[in-house]
């Protein structure tokens, strides 16, 4: 199996293709990307027969920015007979996967696929039973075994394959299912909530998103991101010349500072989180984020980089490299991740966590 399917946001296929070609090439897994505009997925076809499996094992999925999910597949199954779609699919997977831990029957995230998605949900139950009978799936779901993927691109037309549960997205179609809170000031709140799900392991939430932490929200108005911090019982400095939602001010957890987010300098030395969703050139935002991290003004940060119309992968890569270079120059070990989230549009969300510094900085790193 030499093909890897990567699901992405429709309209960002070129960026997804450029990224996987670049990062696979760095690991000497060479191939080419098949791209169809607004399809919501890319197929990276490796030149060597077993390189698809090698790619999804060796390249950390968390290092990808534009892919929501990935899995290795075989040849396209076409013209599945309506009276028996199951038998050909089972046949394709036998000998490829044994005792898989989960089945996901998926489509690309496009308007055209919505009707197909309804079929996929109904089709999952009988297909799961048949795959268990054939030994392709284990009798019970388990996160310790590979995930079996059946990816429909049209009625009666699908790819079959698998991903590794320790190196994929845990979410169906790579999309966390989040509900908009009725009392949130803006829909942007879902971006930060999704970022927490994507970047922070669930078993670390109690420690890293803890009650009583201090946080800063730069460009906070009207408070969509502040809302997520308040919801986790943090104390928040919300920095913006624009007004904050009264509902947030009434909690008593928010201090509104009428200042420019680019000029604000914190006076506290125990700020755990800084978040930022400002509409500004990505290079300017990246420089500000690097300043906060180098100076030890926060321990972790989540921020958005707005994307230009062209060369979007190159622009993001350049900004992330700049931040990494600044951290390296000052002897700071940090973890950097970036992802175009489901709730992002013409932007990517970045998470940076200071691990330790060679030079004494924050008290919690000494």
Curated annotation (Swiss-Prot):
<dbReference type="InterPro" id="IPR002877">
    <property type="entry name" value="RNA_MeTrfase_FtsJ_dom"/>
</dbReference>
<feature type="active site" description="Proton acceptor">
    <location>
        <position position="306"/>
    </location>
</feature>
<dbReference type="GO" id="GO:0070677">
    <property type="term" value="F:rRNA (cytosine-2'-O-)-methyltransferase activity"/>
</dbReference>
<dbReference type="InterPro" id="IPR011224">
    <property type="entry name" value="rRNA_MeTrfase_M"/>
</dbReference>
<dbReference type="Pfam" id="PF21239">
    <property type="entry name" value="RLMM_N"/>
</dbReference>
<feature type="binding site">
    <location>
        <begin position="221"/>
        <end position="224"/>
    </location>
    <ligand>
        <name>S-adenosyl-L-methionine</name>
    </ligand>
</feature>
<protein>
    <recommendedName>
        <fullName>Ribosomal RNA large subunit methyltransferase M</fullName>
        <ecNumber>2.1.1.186</ecNumber>
    </recommendedName>
</protein>
<dbReference type="Pfam" id="PF18125">
    <property type="entry name" value="RlmM_FDX"/>
</dbReference>
<keyword id="KW-0489">Methyltransferase</keyword>
<feature type="binding site">
    <location>
        <position position="260"/>
    </location>
    <ligand>
        <name>S-adenosyl-L-methionine</name>
    </ligand>
</feature>
<feature type="binding site">
    <location>
        <position position="277"/>
    </location>
    <ligand>
        <name>S-adenosyl-L-methionine</name>
    </ligand>
</feature>
<comment type="subunit">
    <text>Monomer.</text>
</comment>
<keyword id="KW-0963">Cytoplasm</keyword>
<dbReference type="InterPro" id="IPR029063">
    <property type="entry name" value="SAM-dependent_MTases_sf"/>
</dbReference>
<feature type="binding site">
    <location>
        <position position="240"/>
    </location>
    <ligand>
        <name>S-adenosyl-L-methionine</name>
    </ligand>
</feature>
<comment type="similarity">
    <text>Belongs to the class I-like SAM-binding methyltransferase superfamily. RNA methyltransferase RlmE family. RlmM subfamily.</text>
</comment>
<dbReference type="InterPro" id="IPR040739">
    <property type="entry name" value="RlmM_FDX"/>
</dbReference>
<feature type="binding site">
    <location>
        <position position="188"/>
    </location>
    <ligand>
        <name>S-adenosyl-L-methionine</name>
    </ligand>
</feature>
<dbReference type="InterPro" id="IPR048646">
    <property type="entry name" value="RlmM_THUMP-like"/>
</dbReference>
<dbReference type="Pfam" id="PF01728">
    <property type="entry name" value="FtsJ"/>
</dbReference>
<dbReference type="GO" id="GO:0006364">
    <property type="term" value="P:rRNA processing"/>
</dbReference>
<keyword id="KW-0698">rRNA processing</keyword>
<keyword id="KW-0808">Transferase</keyword>
<keyword id="KW-0949">S-adenosyl-L-methionine</keyword>
<dbReference type="GO" id="GO:0005737">
    <property type="term" value="C:cytoplasm"/>
</dbReference>
<comment type="function">
    <text>Catalyzes the 2'-O-methylation at nucleotide C2498 in 23S rRNA. Modifies C2498 in naked 23S rRNA, but not in assembled 50S subunits or ribosomes.</text>
</comment>
């Amino acid at each position: 199996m030499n093909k890897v399917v990567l699901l992405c946001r429709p309209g960002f296929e070129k960026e997804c293709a450029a990224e996987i070609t670049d990062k696979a090439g760095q690991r000497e897994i060479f191939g080419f990307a098949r791209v169809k505009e607004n399809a919501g997925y890319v197929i990276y076809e490796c030149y060597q027969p077993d390189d698809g499996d090698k790619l999804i094992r060796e390249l950390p999925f968390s290092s990808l920015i534009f892919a929501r999910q990935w899995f290795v597949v075989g040849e396209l199954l076409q013209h599945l007979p309506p009276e028996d779609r199951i038998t050909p699919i089972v046949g394709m997977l036998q000998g490829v996967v044994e005792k898989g831990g989960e089945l996901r029957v998926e489509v690309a995230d496009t308007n055209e696929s919505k009707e197909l998605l309804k079929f996929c949900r109904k089709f999952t139950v009988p297909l799961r039973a048949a795959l268990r009978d054939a030994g392709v799936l284990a009798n019970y779901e388990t996160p310790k075994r590979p995930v079996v993927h059946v990816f429909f691109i049209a009625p009666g037309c699908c790819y079959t394959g698998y991903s590794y549960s320790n190196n994929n997205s845990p979410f169906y179609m790579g999309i966390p299912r989040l509900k908009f809170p009725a009392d949130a000031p803006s829909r942007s709140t879902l971006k930060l909530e999704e970022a927490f799900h994507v970047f922070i392991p669930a078993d670390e939430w109690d420690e890293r998103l803890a009650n009583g932490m201090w946080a800063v929200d730069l460009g906070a108005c009207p408070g969509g991101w502040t809302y997520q911090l308040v919801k986790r019982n943090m104390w928040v400095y919300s920095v913006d010349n624009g007004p904050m939602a009264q509902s947030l001010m009434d909690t008593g957890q928010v201090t509104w500072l009428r200042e420019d987010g680019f000029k604000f300098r914190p006076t506290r030395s125990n700020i755990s989180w800084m978040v930022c969703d400002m509409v500004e050139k990505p290079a300017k935002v990246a420089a500000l984020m690097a300043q906060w991290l180098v100076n030890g003004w926060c321990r972790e940060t989540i921020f958005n980089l707005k994307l230009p119309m062209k060369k979007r992968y190159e622009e993001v890569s350049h900004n992330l490299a700049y931040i990494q270079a600044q951290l390296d120059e000052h002897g700071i070990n940090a973890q950097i991740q970036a992802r175009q989230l489901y709730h992002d549009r013409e932007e990517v969300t970045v998470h940076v966590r200071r691990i330790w510094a060679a030079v004494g900085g924050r008290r919690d790193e000494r």
